[in-house]
Amino acid sequence: GKKSVWARISVVIAGPVFNFLMAFVFAFILLCNIGYDLPVLAGVTEGYPAEEAGMQAGDTILKIDHTRIHFFRDISAYTQFHSGDAVTVTYERDGERYQTVLTPKYNEEYGYYMYGFQGSAQKTKGSVLSNLKYSVYEVEYWIRVTIDSLKSLVGGKVSVNDMSGPVGIVNMIGDSYEQSVTYGYYMVFLQMLYITIFLS
């Protein structure tokens, strides 16, 4: 009957909802302990687009194209998944908002396109309310990275070997990520979300 249909629906959605709630709780605990990386530039690389556009240390990046930026990792991930693309960057300095278009330069030594953004390994530890807000952003971040990774795989931008589970996804967003966070904790968190998205 009608009741059994709703009962079946509730059973189907209960698993994914519970998994996302668990991921949120884990993100909250994680951020309370190690903090989060704000999208504030520690500097800009000389001779690269960010410097040439007048950006400088202390600028806070708010948006790249139509994607809102909450972590410095958001910048790294977006530029990795849009390698070589000109991007519109919205940033804030001393309470004023600015917008500029950056076209990356190819770095022969490293073998990839660069905009010249420099981040910091420093983490910000916020209030309980702030950590709750950034926990939502954390879950959103990993969902977006996972989806963008799959799009890159389908589009032929990366190989299956590059996408070998959560480790492959993490490798896509750069070695600096591993150096700037408590890597083990994030791997556990990422695996929880990975399982949630694909097995729920």
Language model segments and positions:
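Bilayer-spanning, highly hydrophobic alpha-helical transmembrane segments
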Residues: 22-25, 29, 189-191, 195
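Hydrophobic alpha-helical transmembrane segments in multi-pass membrane proteins
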Residues: 19-27, 145, 183
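Functional transmembrane alpha-helices
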Residues: 2-6, 105-199
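PDZ-domain C-terminal substructure recognizer with occasional recognition of PDZ-binding tails
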Residues: 14, 52, 56, 62-63, ...
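Residue-level recognition of oxygen-bearing side chains
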Residues: 5, 25, 49, 74, ...
